[in-house]
């Protein structure tokens, strides 16, 4: 998703593409990415997410206003093909727009410091941030996270097969 979006939307100046085989530990994967980064802040986007264009345009102002270690970003989750049964099974909250669990805040913009790292192999949690803020729950300041119900079911089966029940809880 992100590579297609980047090719269509962004000038590649200053953007580096790096790949690494996933070893089953998502925190290790994210910490590897941190080690590749330079600069004061890191804007971490998962491979199946993309930012609203306004969010990108306003990043310098967001960082100036929010002099914090971590900025939580609202995320628009869309799941094509879900049914009311899926909503009940997974305990989702669905908005009038069909967004799942909005604003589903994600830790995505954080200072590039050695003490800020990800922990937990699944449903990772960021540690080391002492100060934080949340962007308002507005679509133009959000990440998009589109998927199909088939992908959601496959993802849940992978998590259930490869991670303990305790690890599979946020």
Locate predicted features.
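Acidic donor-binding segment of Leloir-type glycosyltransferases
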Residues: 1-23
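Catalytic-site signature of metal-activated, phosphate-bearing donor transferases
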Residues: 27-34, 41, 50-170
């Amino acid at each position: 998703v992100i590579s297609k979006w980047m090719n269509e939307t962004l000038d590649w100046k200053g953007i580096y593409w790096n790949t690494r085989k996933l070893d089953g530990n998502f925190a290790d994967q994210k910490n590897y990415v941190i080690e590749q980064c330079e600069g004061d802040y890191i804007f971490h986007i998962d491979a199946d997410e993309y930012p609203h264009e306004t969010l990108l345009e306003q990043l310098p102002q967001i960082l100036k206003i929010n002099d914090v270690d971590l900025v939580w970003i609202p995320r628009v989750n869309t799941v094509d093909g879900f049914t009311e049964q899926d909503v009940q099974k997974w305990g989702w909250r669905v908005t009038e727009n069909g967004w799942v669990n909005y604003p589903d805040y994600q830790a995505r913009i954080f200072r590039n410091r050695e003490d800020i790292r990800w922990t937990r192999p699944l449903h990772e949690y960021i540690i080391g941030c002492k100060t934080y803020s949340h962007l308002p729950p507005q679509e133009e300041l959000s990440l998009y996270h589109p998927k199909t119900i088939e992908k959601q079911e496959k993802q849940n089966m992978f998590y259930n097969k490869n991670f303990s029940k305790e690890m599979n809880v946020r």
